[in-house]
């Protein structure tokens, strides 16, 4: 093959590759039927709460999970546990410091199938200005144009500088925090 033919072939191949449609479908989160919750221990007693405001974009095809991407943003000020004192303290500087860090984000840069309806979202979680690699294992059920994903992630809050001053040690509020994600989404928006 001559230089010209090899160059032409390479150009056509590159054009076809770059012009191919994305393998991942676009999904819109149905916030009314979704929750992002958290749980922990305070003075030996369990507590749980949720974030009332969150959203994001998800591109995912279970046949090609490696082509997926997601960016989820959580409004930290929307955290609620039902305990007036705890809910009043969470937005403050000793905890989430929402004036300086109003949102948390999880950006999944790839997905991995783990068998059956199990997957992992691999990416970066940013809370309180600290960004760390995290993997969220989840299960996925798809029925027509509706998807339902459930996942759980265990975090250490001090790794994200959440809980300062007297709260930093874990003596009063445990360092371990569970995050539960229960998302419904619709294909194509």
Report each predicted region and the residues it spans.
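Bacterial N-terminal signal peptides that target proteins for export
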Residues: 1-9
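N-terminal targeting/secretion presequences
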Residues: 2-3, 17-21, 189
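Bacterial N-terminal signal peptides
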Residues: 8-19
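Low-complexity, acidic/polar, glycine-enriched regions of mature
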Residues: 23-189
């Amino acid at each position: 093959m001559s230089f010209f033919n090899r160059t032409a072939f390479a150009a056509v191949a590159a054009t076809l590759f770059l012009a191919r449609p994305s393998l991942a479908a676009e999904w819109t989160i149905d916030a009314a039927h979704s929750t992002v919750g958290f749980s922990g221990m305070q003075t030996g007693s369990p507590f749980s709460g949720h974030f009332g405001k969150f959203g994001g974009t998800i591109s995912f095809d279970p046949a090609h999970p490696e082509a997926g991407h997601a960016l989820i943003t959580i409004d930290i000020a929307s955290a609620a546990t039902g305990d007036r004192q705890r809910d009043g303290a969470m937005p403050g500087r000793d905890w989430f410091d929402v004036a300086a860090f109003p949102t948390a984000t999880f950006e999944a840069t790839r997905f991995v199938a783990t068998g059956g309806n199990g997957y992992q979202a691999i990416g970066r979680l940013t809370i309180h200005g600290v960004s760390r690699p995290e993997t969220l294992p989840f299960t996925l059920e798809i029925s027509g144009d509706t998807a339902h994903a459930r996942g759980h992630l265990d975090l250490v809050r001090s790794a994200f500088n959440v809980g300062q001053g007297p709260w930093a040690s874990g003596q009063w509020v445990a360092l371990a925090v569970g995050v539960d994600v229960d998302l419904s989404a619709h294909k194509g928006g």
